Amino acid sequence: MKNTTETFKNSKFKKEKLVMLTAYDYSTAKIIDSCDINGILVGDSLGMVCLGYENTLSVTMEDMIHHTKAVVRGAKSTLIVADLPFMSYQTSVYDAVFNAGRLVKEAGATAIKLEGGALVCDRIKAIVDAQIPVMGHIGLTPQSVNAFGGFKIQGKNISKAKELIEDAKKIEAAGAFAITLEGIPEKLAKIITESITIPTIGIGAGKHCDGQILVYQDMLGMFSDLAPKFVKRYGNIGDDMKEAFNSYAKEVREGTFPDEAHSFKIDQSIIDEITK
C-alpha cells in the first residue's frame, strides 16, 4: 500500500506509530522502500553526511532537486518528503511557494518540509494553498544553528517551552499535515503531541511522538565521529565497509582477486591463433 499524507494523518487517530528514515540516493531509497517504513525524508542533512559540510547551510536547491530525483526513482510506495534548504523560503512567500513547487514538479517529491515556527506560518499556508503538502519542523532546527549558538536542545525553559507549543498549534492551523519535533525534552514533546491533531515525528524528542525519524547513516553506525545522544545504532556498517574494503585491497595486492571464478573464459584455439 502506498503511503500518503492522508496515511500519516490517519495514523494518529489509529494510534499507529509512523516510521521514517532519510535517504539521498536511488540505492538506499530502493532498500528502504522494500521495508516496513512509512516515509523517506530527503533531508538537507545530505550536506553533512553526503557532501561533507559542517552544517546544512551550504545546501542549495540544485542539491535538493538532484538527490530527491534519485530517491523518487528508487521508492514507489514510501511517502517522499523533501527539505526546503536554507534561504530558499526565508526571503519571501513567493520564493517559498516557487521553490516548494520545484521540489514537487522537477524532483517528484510528494511533500516538502521547512523549518521554523510562527514566523514561517505564512509560507506554510501559501504552499498548502498551492496544493503542496507541508511538514513543519520545530525545536532544534539545524538551519538556525548560528542563531542558536550551536546544536543545542530547545524548549528547556518556561518561555521557550510555551513558544514551541504555540508554534505547533499555529503550524497545524496553517495547514501542515505533520510536524517534526527535533531536539526537545521528552515530556515537552508529549505535551505538544497531545495538543495538536496532526502527527508529530520525533528525532531526539522521546518516545511520545506519533512517529520517529533518524538519519540512516547514524542508525547504521556508518560514521564513528557522528553520534548524537538520541541515536541508537542498529548496525555497524562503517566497520563492515572498512573490513570489506581492506579485504578487497589485500586480495588485489596478493593477486588472489580476481580468481578464475570471477573471470571470463575464451576458447584456447582463439588464443593460439592470435598469438602465432
From Swiss-Prot:
GO terms for cellular component: cytoplasm. This is 3-methyl-2-oxobutanoate hydroxymethyltransferase. InterPro entries: Pantoate_hydroxy_MeTrfase (IPR003700), Pyrv/PenolPyrv_kinase-like_dom (IPR015813), Pyrv_kinase-like_dom_sf (IPR040442). Belongs to the PanB family. Catalyzes the reversible reaction in which hydroxymethyl group from 5,10-methylenetetrahydrofolate is transferred onto alpha-ketoisovalerate to form ketopantoate. Its cofactor is Mg(2+). The active site is at E182 (proton acceptor). Its EC number is 2.1.2.11. It is found in: Cytoplasm. Keywords: Cytoplasm, Magnesium, Metal-binding, Pantothenate biosynthesis, Transferase. Mg(2+) binds at D44, D83, E115. It is an enzyme of class 2 (transferase). GO terms for biological process: pantothenate biosynthetic process. It catalyses: 3-methyl-2-oxobutanoate + (6R)-5,10-methylene-5,6,7,8-tetrahydrofolate + H2O = 2-dehydropantoate + (6S)-5,6,7,8-tetrahydrofolate. Pathway: Cofactor biosynthesis; (R)-pantothenate biosynthesis; (R)-pantoate from 3-methyl-2-oxobutanoate: step 1/2. Homodecamer; pentamer of dimers.
